[in-house]
Amino acid sequence: KEELLMLKERQGSIILCRIKLAEAILLAANEAYHLGMTEEATKLFAGFRTGMGMGGTCGALSGAIGVLSSKYGTREDLKTICADFVAAFEQKLALGTTECRPLAAKYKQRQTLSDAVELTAEALEEFIDKLEGKAPAEGCTLRSEDIKRVKGMGF
């Protein structure tokens, strides 16, 4: 999907520039979903780096919650939306946790944390599509050629 690929591409360039996960998710989604946030506003998420500096809640998750808050902040069910996304995040990253330390331990064993960013981007895209009625009930999937294209970009 074009939005997901754009989200992943933007995150890749942000990660390469050494911006942390919370800001990477937020900046990429801001561009992909036209949220209208200034780069200055995204600095509000700098404190969510490395689990708020102590290995707590994953920065990528914090950034994704920021995206959901920006898109759906006026909805009465925002609390449920966020809780449902946290569950989707835990399932997608396959550790059943939102904590930075165990996630970093798993994903640092790979080349970089870009796998965690990619999985968070996928979870966010699938979640938003489902929430907006765009995805089938079982969730959306990437085509193999999309994955190959993104991996060819250094992910």
Feature locations, PLM:
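Polybasic, low-complexity association/targeting segments
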Residues: 1-17
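An acidic intrinsically disordered interaction segment
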Residues: 16-35, 84-88
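Phosphate-handling active-site elements
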Residues: 32-43, 69-83
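Buried hydrophobic packing segments
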Residues: 22-29, 63-71, 120, 124
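Acidic-glycine-rich active-site phosphate/pyrophosphate-binding loop
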Residues: 25-45, 92-98
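C-terminal binding/interaction regions
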Residues: 83-155
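Short, hydrophobic/aliphatic alpha-helical segments
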Residues: 3-5, 35-51, 152-154
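Glycine/serine-rich anion-binding loops at beta->alpha junctions
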Residues: 50-67
